[in-house]
């Protein structure tokens, strides 16, 4: 019996000793990790933002497969936070040459301008602006220096929209869409009742696109320090070579992405400068600043 209690007591003591050692080990690891984090916190960084991956309007949380998608709002908040962070020296952007939503394009532009207001630089590199609309270009036009690969071209175009019409389809199945439509410019129902654009629908769509286009041209002209006529002239006469885009002040330098990246590193302070993605930097608890997306 005595041997039994001795074994039980020894087991209990052993368990407590094990957990004590385990807790102490975690505390040591935490202390070392904190010290390393403190050391890393002294590093200086250039933030990097890859707009080619596309951005959601708002963060949608983690996906089943892959990482959490970046969002326009989190990106804007992160840049607003970074402008007052002394460890962040600048921003390096990979431009989107495919397409971008109007609100996202304008929000990123304002976020870049807000970041620059602290005196920090923004360097953007584009592999080319070929076959894309004016919106991805407008997003980065406020960069301090806009680089483009010299082997590509500049063919930023205007805007267009497409609508599908199912008028007459339902009738083939002895069905009839019943919708209330108030005035001719309330055109949501036209998708199901018309076979093409009505005059009012076409006017509304054209007016909307013209407003977006004119606004983008004005902002680009402001950012590039040229007239709106000059911007429209190069857009209307596209495509252009990289050299022609440089002469027209639509880009500032020609070079490959590695050259632009190293240029940003040197501008920030040299080889000791590290790069950190805007997503990894994160918005923190910063809810200041205006967002429109």
Identify the meaning behind each predicted range:
Residues 234-240:
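Short helix-initiation/N-cap motifs at beta->coil->alpha
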Residues 1-228, 239, 261, 265-293:
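Small-residue-centered hinge/linker elements
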Residues 256-258:
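Extracellular glycan-binding segments that recognize GlcNAc-based cell-wall polysaccharides
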């Amino acid at each position: 019996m005595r041997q039994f209690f001795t074994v039980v007591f020894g087991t209990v003591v052993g368990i407590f000793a094990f957990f004590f050692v385990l807790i102490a080990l975690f505390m040591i690891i935490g202390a070392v990790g904190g010290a390393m984090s403190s050391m890393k916190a002294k590093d200086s960084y250039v933030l990097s933002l890859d707009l080619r991956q596309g951005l959601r309007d708002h963060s949608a949380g983690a996906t089943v497969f892959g990482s959490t998608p970046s969002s326009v709002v989190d990106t804007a908040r992160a840049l607003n936070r970074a402008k007052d962070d002394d460890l962040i020296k600048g921003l390096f952007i990979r431009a989107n040459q495919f397409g971008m939503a109007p609100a996202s394009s304008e929000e990123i532009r304002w976020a870049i301008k807000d970041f620059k207001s602290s005196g920090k630089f923004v360097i953007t590199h584009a592999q080319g602006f070929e076959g894309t609309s004016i919106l991805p270009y407008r997003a980065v036009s406020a960069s301090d220096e806009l680089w483009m690969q010299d082997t590509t071209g500049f063919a930023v175009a205007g805007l267009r929209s497409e609508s599908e019409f199912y008028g007459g389809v339902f009738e083939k199945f002895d069905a009839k869409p019943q919708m209330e439509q108030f005035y001719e410019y309330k055109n949501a129902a036209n998708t199901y009742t018309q076979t093409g654009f009505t005059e009012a629908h076409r006017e509304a769509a054209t007016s909307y696109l013209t407003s977006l286009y004119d606004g983008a041209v004005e902002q680009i002209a402001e950012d590039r320090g040229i007239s709106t006529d000059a911007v429209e002239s190069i857009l209307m006469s596209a495509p252009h070579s990289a050299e022609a885009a440089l002469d027209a002040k639509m880009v500032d330098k020609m070079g490959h992405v590695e050259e632009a990246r190293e240029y940003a590193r040197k501008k920030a302070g040299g080889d000791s400068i590290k790069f950190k993605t805007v997503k990894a930097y994160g918005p923190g608890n910063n809810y200041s600043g205006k967002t429109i997306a």
